[in-house]
């Protein structure tokens, strides 16, 4: 093989290795940043296709904060609360300042890591804007298995239970 062909072959191989490494790193980064969305029922019972998250997996969970479940640590910013749709409840532990719209009975989406089968250590908690708004993922997941809630005018105004 003459020197010109060797040089060309080396250049092609280097280009192939570089492109392969770039694609591999991009796929790895995308996989690390992917958070799957679950409802509390799907987290406990599994999704319809049978998949269940593993302990240590990053995920997002959406549902309603269960009334009477919010427990605040008096020595830190840590808060634990339960989230449910119409099925099982899942405990969310969050160490930080909660959004102003966070309250019991309110819809939330928490992003974090699954600590055990029914506990999530969240690093972000988002509250929905009003009683009518629901994050698209939560609405879609709840629409599949649940009937929509019918609010009275008092409940919409925030004066009734």
Swiss-Prot record:
InterPro entries: CcmE (IPR004329), CcmE-like_sf (IPR036127), NA-bd_OB-fold (IPR012340). Heme binds at residues 129, 133. It comes from the Bacteria. One of its GO terms (biological process) is cytochrome complex assembly. It is a single-pass type II membrane protein. Residues 142-161 are annotated as: Disordered. SUPFAM superfamilies: Heme chaperone CcmE (SSF82093). Keywords: Cell inner membrane, Cell membrane, Cytochrome c-type biogenesis, Heme, Iron, Membrane, Metal-binding, Signal-anchor, Transmembrane, Transmembrane helix. Heme chaperone required for the biogenesis of c-type cytochromes. Transiently binds heme delivered by CcmC and transfers the heme to apo-cytochromes in a process facilitated by CcmF and CcmH. This is Cytochrome c-type biogenesis protein CcmE. It comes from Aliivibrio fischeri (strain MJ11) (Vibrio fischeri).
């Amino acid at each position: 093989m003459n020197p010109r062909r060797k040089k060309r072959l080396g250049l092609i191989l280097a280009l192939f290795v570089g492109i392969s490494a770039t694609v591999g790193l991009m796929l790895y980064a995308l996989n690390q940043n992917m958070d799957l969305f679950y409802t509390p029922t799907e987290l406990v019972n599994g999704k319809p296709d049978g998949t269940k998250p593993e302990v240590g997996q990053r995920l997002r969970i959406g549902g309603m904060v269960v009334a009477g479940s919010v427990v605040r640590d008096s020595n830190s910013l840590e808060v634990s609360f339960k989230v449910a749709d119409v099925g099982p409840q899942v405990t969310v532990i969050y160490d930080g300042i909660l959004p102003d719209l966070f309250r019991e009975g309110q819809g939330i989406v928490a992003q974090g890591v699954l600590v055990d089968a029914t506990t999530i250590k969240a690093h972000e908690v988002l509250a929905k804007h009003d009683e009518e708004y629901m994050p698209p993922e939560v609405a879609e997941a709840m629409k599949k298995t649940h009937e929509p809630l019918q609010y009275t005018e008092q409940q919409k105004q925030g004066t009734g239970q």
